[in-house]
Every structure is written in C-alpha cells, then in structure tokens.
C-alpha cells in the first residue's frame, strides 16, 4: 500500500432521505440484494449531519465498523437540498418547502480524489432530474465504481499547503497533541471542512492514512497484533526502513478511535470509560456545550482556535525554540511557492509531508537515544569514541518526550522498533539540518544510503559511528 494513496474497494452506494416524522432514513441501497449490516444502523445519522439544512451542499466523512470483523469502513456522503416545487412529482409525504437527501459511498479506505469529484457530479445529476424515483444515474455510478477490471487507487488529494498556511505553528502543536493520545473534539459548521482538517492532520504522520483499520471502535486492535520487530533492514527499501523505525505508529489502538463526524447518537461512545483517546468531529452545537465533560482539547476548525480544557496539555505540547524556528522556515517556503503545483517541489504537499516525516523520524531516534543514555553509566559512555549530541532532547522538548513515553503508542512502538535506531537515523531535530543540502538529497540519503554501523567502544570494531542521516 502506497503512502500517497491506498487501494480500496467500494462496498455499497446508498441514498438517505430526511422524513419530517421519522428523521433520516435509508431509501435506496446498491447492490440492491445487499444484506444491510446491523453494525451500520447509524448510517442515516452520519450521512445527513446536524445543521445540514443550513447549507445547499456539503460533504461528510465518517467511519463505521466492518461487519463481523475487527476493521473499519469509510463513508463519504454528499448532501443536497432541493426546493420541493422543483420536483416533477411531489411525494405525499413531502410536507416541507425543501427536500433534503444524501448520496453515500462506503469504501474500505478513505474516499478522496476522483471518488469525491464523481460523487459530487452524480449527486447533482440525481437532483437535477427532479424525479428521485429515477435511479438510473445512481445504478450506473455504482456499476462503474465496482467494475472488476478497474484498478482503483485513491490519491490523498488533501491540500496541506492551505492547512499549514491556516494553522501555521499550531499545526505542529496539534500534531503533538495527537501523538500524546489526547481526547480531541473538533467543531465546524461545515462537515466538509471538518473532515478535511482531521484527515490533513493525520496525513502528517507517515503510514497513517494506509493503516486506519482499527479507528472505528475503541475495542479494535487488530493492527497491533499483526506487528512484529523486523529481523533485518534492507537499506534500499523504504518500506523496510519504515518497519525498522517502528511504523506504522498505533495512534488509534485499543481504547482509541477516530470519528471524523460524530452525531449525537454516538456521543455515548466518546464518553465511555473505555474510550481513553480519540479524535472526533462534530457540527452539533449541543455537543459543544457538553464538551468539557469529555474532551481534553477543543479545536475550532472554522476559526482556527485551540482550547486546552486540561491546561497541562498546553504546557506539554508547547513548541520549543527549535520547533518554532523549524515551522517558521517551512511556512515561509510554503507561502513563497503557493502558485506552484508541481508534485515534490519545495513547498508542495509532498514536500510538506517529507518535512514532517523527517521530524517524526528524528523524534523517534531521539527517544531511543534518550533511553540508551539513561541505561548507561558515565563510565561506559566515556568509552565510546563518538556519541550524537544530546541537544536533540531539548530541541524536541524533554517534557513532551517523557509524556509520549507514557502512551500506548510508545509501548507498542518501543517493542517493535530497533533499540539501535539512532545508529541508523541521527537523533536530530530537522531544524538542525543543513539547509544548503536540497531536500531531495536528504530524503535520498534517508531512504537509499542508510548504513548500519556498530557503536564503537575501545577494544571493539571502530566502524564509523556517524549515522547516515
């Protein structure tokens, strides 16, 4: 599975309508012979979000448990409303001036790119008919999505440049909060903006977007059970290096969940004692009024504000001087390249991901190095001909690193990542990189020219102790 995209399967297509007495309900389902899973009974409430009547069009991202399995499916709903007078045949149960419906796609991976674009087009065509009983356009769309010969890959298609320019240095604060496994509630009147914000944040973490199979339920932890410490490292293989470094990081393991849109009907899951960590989004003001009882951090993606319900988290995730300098440099480079759309170009979305990849790689190497130093006596350390600088610890923030080492994410990662990781990847904040070296050269060094060298002590092999990165 590729980091810039994930192969996927379309499981079903549905239409959701809003009945003035019964509320949101499923009207049509493709394939029509599908045995609808009981685990998806919440689908109508996910597809037509709270406040949907206040906008003509919106997109909703949501997650559901995979039927009879430890896994997750991903939903994308395109909501529209139409003036009832525009209908050719007004159904007897339509008693309001407007009709509100959604067309929904359920897939095995987050649906972005052309799936979203095509869903928008098809939904518009379905509404433009003025006859909701004519399902031909939906039936044809489903057949196109499920053609066996179609090899579908979904590009992330997330605008990280906008995300970074809007959130600026707080983008790194939010990443630190996420890494610490806190309970994060995101609010926005726009469900589309709500989902885009959360997926943008997740996409900053290497391998995250292709390893979201456990996010729909706090009880799911199949990914953790499948991980193991690699027996070897192939320096020319990026996947091998990622595995050696301990990826994927289990941000949403047992006790955690990711719910990009959360209706009132799911609030009890967030409030449960078993839900110790989550990232959840809402458009409902009632949930916001009650947020202090369950969330530790409140994010307003519409106004770009962060509220720390627990003030200690603000201190733990505050940026170091080195963090701030690094973010200033990245933002400057992004803003100077806003008109450039070439993939991989300095300031592009791929380039931004590479920067945060280097940041997290350096952080993980720093944690291993920190623990190595703590285990050794000064008399032993003095025998080494070379050891990396310890400035990396303060550059990332010692209190932040210590707090991260209390998380479930750290526990799982520490068991599978090699203890000598800092021999391969230099424990160094990316702000300390030599800016004269092009990013392409640094990435090439990281993934193509890694060489493992033993720590050299007196009387032992004195191979170069300088890590490759």
Curated annotation (Swiss-Prot):
Its GO biological process terms? post-Golgi vesicle-mediated transport
User: Which parts of the sequence belong to the uDENN domain?
Assistant: 11-150
Look up keyword DNA damage and say if it applies: no
Name the domain of life this protein comes from: Eukaryota
InterPro entries reported in the protein's UniProt record? ABL9/DENND6_dom (IPR018307), DENND11/AVL9_GEFs (IPR051731), Tripartite_DENN (IPR037516)
What keywords would UniProt list here? Cytoplasm
Give the transmembrane ranges. none
Q: Where in the cell is it found?
A: Cytoplasm
For this UniProt entry, which residues form the secretion signal? none
Q: Where is it mostly found? A: cytoplasm
Domain cDENN, first and last residues per copy: 163-332
**Which stretches make up the dDENN domain?**
334-437
**Entry annotated with the keyword Cytoplasm:** yes
- What Gene Ontology terms describe where this protein resides (cellular component)? cytoplasm; endosome
Tell me the disulfide pairings in this chain.
none
Q: Give the Pfam families listed for this entry.
A: Avl9
Q: What family name appears in the similarity comment? A: Belongs to the AVL9 family.
* Biological function: Functions in the late secretory pathway. Required for the generation of secretory vesicles as well as for actin polarization and polarized growth.
Q: What is the protein name given in its UniProt record?
A: Late secretory pathway protein avl9
Q: Which gene encodes it?
A: avl9
């Amino acid at each position: 599975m590729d980091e810039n995209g994930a192969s996927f399967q379309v499981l079903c297509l549905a239409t959701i309508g809003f009945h003035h007495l019964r509320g949101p309900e499923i009207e049509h389902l493709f394939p029509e012979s599908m045995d609808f899973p009981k685990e998806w009974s919440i689908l109508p409430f996910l597809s037509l979000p709270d406040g949907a009547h206040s906008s003509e069009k919106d997109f909703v991202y949501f997650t559901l448990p995979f039927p009879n399995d430890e896994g997750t499916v991903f939903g994308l709903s395109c909501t529209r409303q139409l003036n009832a007078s525009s209908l050719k045949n007004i159904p007897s149960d339509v008693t309001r001036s407007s009709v509100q419906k959604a067309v929904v796609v359920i897939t095995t991976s987050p649906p972005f790119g052309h799936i979203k674009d095509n869903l928008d087009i098809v939904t518009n065509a379905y509404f433009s008919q003025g006859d909701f009983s004519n399902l031909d356009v939906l039936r044809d769309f489903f057949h196109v999505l499920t053609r066996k010969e179609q090899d579908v890959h979904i590009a992330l298609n997330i605008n990280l440049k906008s995300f970074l320019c809007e959130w600026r240095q707080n983008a790194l604060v939010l990443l630190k909060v996420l890494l610490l496994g806190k309970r994060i509630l995101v609010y926005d009147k726009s469900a589309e903006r709500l989902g885009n914000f959360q997926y943008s944040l997740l996409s900053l973490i290497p391998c995250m977007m292709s390893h979201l199979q456990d996010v729909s339920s706090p009880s799911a932890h199949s990914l953790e059970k499948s991980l193991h410490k690699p027996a070897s490292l192939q320096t020319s293989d990026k996947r091998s290096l990622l595995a050696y470094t301990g990826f994927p990081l289990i941000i949403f393991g047992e006790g955690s969940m990711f719910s990009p849109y959360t209706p009132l009907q799911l609030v009890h899951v967030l409030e449960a004692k078993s839900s110790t960590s989550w990232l959840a989004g809402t458009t409902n003001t009632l949930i916001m009024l009650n947020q202090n009882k369950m969330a530790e951090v409140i994010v307003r993606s519409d106004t770009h504000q962060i509220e720390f319900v627990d003030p200690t988290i603000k201190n733990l995730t505050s940026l170091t001087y080195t963090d701030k300098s690094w973010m200033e440099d990245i933002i400057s480079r992004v803003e100077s390249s806003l008109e450039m759309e070439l993939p991989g170009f300095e300031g592009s979305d791929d380039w931004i991901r590479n920067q945060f990849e280097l940041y997290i790689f350096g952080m993980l190497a720093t944690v291993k190095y920190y623990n190595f130093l703590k285990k050794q006596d000064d008399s032993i350390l003095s025998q080494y001909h070379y050891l990396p600088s310890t400035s990396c610890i303060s550059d990332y923030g010692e209190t932040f690193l210590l707090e991260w080492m209390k998380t479930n994410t750290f526990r799982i990662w520490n068991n599978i990542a090699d203890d000598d990781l800092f021999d391969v990847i230099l424990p160094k904040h990316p702000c300390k990189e030599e800016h004269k070296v092009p990013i392409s050269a640094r990435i090439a060094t990281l993934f193509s020219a890694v060489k493992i060298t033993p720590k050299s002590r007196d009387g032992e092999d004195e191979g170069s102790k300088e890590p490759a990165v």
